């Protein structure tokens, strides 16, 4: 439990009908009495009060709500003052609260206290920020599922199975004189494989959540005049890039953000890739390659009337980019041929000018990045994926120790490390540095 009391404005900056000031800590109730002229407050009831300055001058009127700890969001005594949404009034309430003994809260400190007081776990704390920042209806619903504990329950169930397996393995090590060889009776191997399978399922679901939360960096590349800028204009539904018949019109990076079936898509148009003596164009090409190396997915746009462009540039991309970055080849300008729009796993035929084939392109993008919306989906972060991948690697190492070497002690250690890694997701075992990084990204007042 914290020894100091914090205060912050909990509503967005600017003017509004209502503004909320939140106070949390051991002196929250006493500070509220200083502000409302010593008018008694009942827990979990809204009380209409005049709000005073230190000189007993009325500064506003509003509702004051008292949540007595531990039955509050933070687990501490919490006061919420609903005043008129004037920045001046809210600032005065903050100043009076500080004068009465509070200090200004750090970003995310209310949620941090809720976590430290076991009111929420780390996944739920992150979900609060994700819900506030959600970019679509689906992302908001999935963030709410994480806040309600859907993701946490899956991790906790996995940990329970892992704890049982650890007990089984360590019992086999501690009691080697037993007639039954627990490590070789097949039960340990079956339990371990079941846990690995469940972890893979959770990882797949979490990946969908990461796509919804963070979106994709989609870089459009190709030779000059292949139709890249026309394509980004069509995807955006408006003219964001200059389009001319002159090759090399695009010199710098062009960015646009859209939603693709609720996935935030960060589209990046780049300069045409070719050898050039023009200093400005060379810089644009250099930046294009930098963006390509950071991409989640690359669209290689090829003029269908010049298909020879495709082979040399595709080979160059494959040699230069990491293998994990998928490349979709887009044959553009089918409106100048007798071809119709079509697609397969990594290839699309379309017309960026007319929009024919655009739906096929969107379908292929979702397939290539593995987006498959399912029931029970929740929002997740990249750190969750990293922890799940690390835990899986440890379990596979332990499986190898069991299968190839019958090394019970080494298996037990890998299981322990995997368990600890999974606990980092919910915050049961988490470094102070990680906590500071997570909560500092929150809004003040949350």
From Swiss-Prot:
Any one Gene Ontology MF annotation carried by this entry is: GTPase activity
TrmE-type G domain mapped to chain residues = 215-370
The entry's Mg(2+)-binding residues are 229, 250
- What cellular component terms from Gene Ontology apply here? cytosol
Is the keyword Ligase in the record? no
**Residues annotated as binding (6S)-5-formyl-5,6,7,8-tetrahydrofolate:** 22, 80, 119, 446
Is GTP-binding found in the keyword set? yes
Identify one Pfam family in the record: MnmE_helical
Per its Swiss-Prot or TrEMBL entry, what cofactor is needed? K(+)
CDD domains membership: trmE, TrmE_N
Query: What EC number(s) does its UniProt record assign?
Result: 3.6.-.-
Q: Which InterPro entries match?
A: G_TrmE, GTP-bd, GTP-bd_TrmE_N, GTPase_MnmE, MnmE_dom2, MnmE_helical, P-loop_NTPase, Small_GTP-bd
Binding, GTP: 225-230, 244-250, 269-272
Q: Any binding details for the cofactor?
A: Binds 1 potassium ion per subunit.
Location within or outside the cell: Cytoplasm
Write the record's keywords in alphabetical order, separated by commas. Cytoplasm, GTP-binding, Hydrolase, Magnesium, Metal-binding, Nucleotide-binding, Potassium, tRNA processing
- Matches recorded under Gene3D superfamilies: P-loop containing nucleotide triphosphate hydrolases, Probable tRNA modification gtpase trme, domain 1, tRNA modification GTPase MnmE domain 2
- Cite a single GO BP annotation: tRNA methylation
Q: Which residues bind K(+)?
A: 225, 244, 246, 249
The organism's superkingdom is given as Bacteria
Task: Return the HAMAP family for the record.
Answer: GTPase_MnmE
Q: Report the function annotation for this chain.
A: Exhibits a very high intrinsic GTPase hydrolysis rate. Involved in the addition of a carboxymethylaminomethyl (cmnm) group at the wobble position (U34) of certain tRNAs, forming tRNA-cmnm(5)s(2)U34.
Similarity annotation: Belongs to the TRAFAC class TrmE-Era-EngA-EngB-Septin-like GTPase superfamily. TrmE GTPase family.
Provide the assembly information.
Homodimer. Heterotetramer of two MnmE and two MnmG subunits.
Q: This chain belongs to which protein, by name?
A: tRNA modification GTPase MnmE
**UniProt lineage:** Bacteria, Pseudomonadati, Pseudomonadota, Gammaproteobacteria, Legionellales
